[in-house]
Amino acid sequence: GAVMKQLRKQGAGPKAEKVALSTAQRWALVEKLARAGVISANKIPHKPLELGANMARNVISPDLLPTVPGPLPKGASRLPETPREGAQALYFPACINRIFGRPAGAAPDSVDLPRAVVELGRRSGQPVWIPDDVAGDCCGTPWSSKGYTEGFEYQATKIVRDLWHWSEHGKLPIIVDAASCTHGLLDSVPEALSEADKELWSQLRIMDV
């Protein structure tokens, strides 16, 4: 937990910290490339894909590049369009659910989690709204868990300011579709904020789907 994060923070060198910050600043592009990569990877046999990923991890960094489990889930579909008017909640799809879609082996007529949440809201008479510019925002866990302070501070500040703006200064409740993301927003993000941004964060009503 906290001890491991501190150890990782102490072990993060300047080069890795710089790469992590650059990744945080370009997260929308990273999302797009990752999603395209998952879609492409589903067309490649698992063994060659795993070998290539491991080689890349050895060259770049095992901390920044994940292993390739198998079988891979599908790449996420485009987020559903939702109107702001009449919405009862702001829906923030976690970046993991903006990259990965249906699990391997899912029924052909099944839908991605974001579409399921939107449809559930519609049927229950509690429609949700997904901002058009949600790409590029993240709870910061990929950086905080590895001890990359600058990248974490950048994303924590960005998401709090965006959520505050999207929710009309806290008027709309915010629902999140990944427990780890909700936890990060509620427990970890405040540690990386300035006093002014902590005030914005305190006005947000964040809850797990």
Q: What is the meaning of each model-derived region?
A:
Residues 2-209:
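Iron-sulfur cluster-binding electron-transfer modules in prokaryotic oxidoreductases
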